[in-house]
Structures are given as structure tokens and as C-alpha cells.
């Protein structure tokens, strides 16, 4: 398993980590199996989504903001980031991606994203673990 550090520069962002994951499975020598990619934070998640059109990311983040507005007077959490926790629970903390013949099994337009919902932050982290078999 390898842990990667990432800095985020926006309150909400989706950072394409596909090539980091692809490189890691090659380094681990996984030919056929799967890889688990997991965020190590309660306010940042991992998702697989389109990586060809940047408007998809913009729309994705905007729609999450519509569902989970940042300022909600009824929220009790003292840090004021309840929306970030809800977004992370919706997206999920991890993804499992198949590996075939040494490469990720992703569709033409798919990429793996680290989703920041409480940034900007320094030293965010995610773990990558490949499993042969």
C-alpha cells in the first residue's frame, strides 16, 4: 500500500488522480486483480467520473452545493463543515477499480478523482492498494 499526499487549492475541487493510481499498480506489479483507492479524511472522497469534459466537474460540484448548501442555520456541528461531511458520504470514501493485463479497467471517458469538500487544504492524503488475483 502507498499513501499519497495532495494539496488542494479550492473550497471544493475534483483532482484527477488516475495517473498516480495507474503508476502505483505498475510499481506494485499487479497484472490482474483490483485496486482500492481510499481517502483518509471525512471531508474528502474518491469517485470515478468523466475526465474528458471539465464542465462535468464544474456541474458535479455545483449540483452537490445545491443539495448540500454550505451555510445551514440548523446545523449543529461546531466546525461549520457539515456540508463537507454530507458530500463525502454521498460520494463515498473509496473506489475499487479492476485491473486487467496491468492496467486499470476504465471506460474511455472515465477518470479517478480525489474530491475535496472542505478546502483549500495542505497534506490531504489517499491510499492505494493493489490486489493480485
Where are these regions (language model features)?
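Active-site histidine-anchored catalytic micro-motif
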Residues: 1-133
Amino acid at each position: 500500500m502507498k499513501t499519497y499526499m495532495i494539496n488542494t487549492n479550492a473550497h471544493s475541487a475534483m483532482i484527477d488522480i488516475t495517473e498516480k493510481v495507474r503508476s502505483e499498480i505498475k510499481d506494485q506489479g499487479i497484472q490482474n486483480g483490483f485496486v482500492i483507492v481510499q481517502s483518509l479524511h471525512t471531508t474528502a472522497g474518491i469517485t470515478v467520473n468523466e475526465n474528458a469534459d471539465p464542465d462535468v466537474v464544474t456541474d458535479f460540484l455545483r449540483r452537490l452545493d445545491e443539495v448540500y448548501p454550505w451555510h445551514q442555520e440548523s446545523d449543529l456541528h461546531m466546525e461549520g463543515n457539515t456540508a463537507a461531511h454530507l458530500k463525502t458520504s454521498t460520494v463515498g470514501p473509496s473506489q475499487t477499480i479492476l485491473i486487467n493485463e496491468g492496467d486499470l479497467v476504465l471506460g474511455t471517458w472515465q477518470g479517478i478523482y480525489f474530491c475535496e469538500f472542505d478546502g483549500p487544504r495542505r497534506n490531504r492524503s489517499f491510499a492505494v492498494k493493489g490486489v493480485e488475483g
